[in-house]
Regions:
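Transmembrane alpha-helices and immediately adjacent membrane-cytoplasm interface residues
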Residues: 1-20
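Membrane-proximal soluble helical/coiled-coil segments
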Residues: 24-125
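PP2C/PPM family metal-dependent serine/threonine protein phosphatase catalytic domain
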Residues: 37, 44-57, 117-119, 150-182, ...
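Conserved beta-strand-loop-short alpha-helix elements that form
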Residues: 71-84, 144-146, 184-205, 250
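Catalytic core of PPM/PP2C metal-dependent serine/threonine phosphatase domains
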Residues: 86-160, 164-165, 178, 237-240, ...
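Active-site-proximal, acidic helix/loop segment immediately C-terminal to a metal-coordinating Asp/Glu
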Residues: 87-97, 101, 168, 185-240, ...
Length: 282
């Protein structure tokens, strides 16, 4: 019995050590996919939040990054299908490719194409990555490329506007030809980027989170308070029983003249082969 007890104690200790190593790896991986962001860049206030569906759950494939470039501030938020190590590794490839292309490539739709091409060798048979890429130009105009992701929400004048182009695009990794569209970006506007855990949050009756709950939360005094209010609204709606991770990015247009939008900026859409074609944003 004494020998058996010693053996069992050894097995227990090794399991605890393995769990501790896996926890450390998960925490380091989450930090790599969801890096700390500065509170402000050239007059744009920034806040970010990540909430796992369940405490201690496997780190999923939610990711985000913000990079100042010569073409403006470039942002990505994305969601890799699945959880665990495979999702983490694929998400890291997405961020690595975005960081390279965001700095070196002039057109945002080409950045999306380069990221899509770069991650293709790492995709499994059923893998995919949805993402939204946003560029905030020095003049304040927004450029958006949506790769199969939930569309950004523009909070303006107390209401929400969904930013969508006229054509749907597939997730990253499936093709390399993407469409960009533009939208105006005015002082005081807030842009919310998010993963599906937000809009797919359901209550006990199966109802999704109402849009007016999001709009109300975004009225808070600053971006950090707004995201805290939004997560609190999700918690109340779901009773604390969310079924998916939530990553949130909120950017607010400040009064810095470098980010002031020109008056009457038209909404347009472009593809690499049709740079002047008009489009719509709803």
């Amino acid at each position: 019995m004494g020998l058996l007890a010693v053996m069992l104690a050894g097995v227990h200790r090794r399991c605890e050590e393995r769990l501790a190593r896996m926890t450390a790896i998960a925490q380091a991986s989450q930090l790599a996919l969801l890096p700390p962001l500065p509170p402000q860049i050239t007059g744009i206030s920034i806040a970010a939040r990540y909430r796992s569906a369940t405490p201690g759950a496997s780190v999923g494939g939610d990711l985000y990054e913000i990079i100042p470039t010569g073409n403006g501030i470039r942002v990505i938020i994305g969601d890799v299908r699945g959880k665990g190590l495979d999702a983490i590794l694929l998400a890291r490839q997405v961020l690595s490719a975005f960081r390279r292309s965001a700095v070196a490539t002039p057109a945002l739709e080409h950045v999306a194409g380069e990221v899509s091409l770069a991650i293709r060798p790492y995709l499994g048979e059923e893998d995919f990555v949805t993402a939204v890429l946003v560029q905030i130009a020095p003049g304040g105009e927004l450029t958006v490329v949506n790769c199969g992701h939930h569309p950004p929400l523009l909070h303006h004048g107390g209401g929400l506007r969904t930013l969508t182009g006229s054509t749907a695009a597939p997730p990253l990794g499936l093709e390399d030809d993407f469409t960009a569209f533009t939208a105006s970006w005015l002082p005081g506007d807030r842009l919310l980027l998010y993963t599906d855990g937000l809009v797919e949050s359901r209550n006990q009756h199966g109802d999704f989170l109402p849009e007016d709950h999001i709009a109300t939360a975004l009225l808070a005094a600053d971006c950090d308070q707004a995201l805290d209010a939004l997560l609190a609204a999700v918690h109340r709606h779901t009773g604390g029983h969310g079924h998916d991770d939530i990553a949130l990015l909120l950017l607010e247009h400040g009064a810095d003249p470098r980010t002031a939008a020109p008056a009457d900026t038209p909404d347009t859409e472009r593809r690499p082969d049709a740079p002047d074609r008009k489009g719509t944003v709803r």
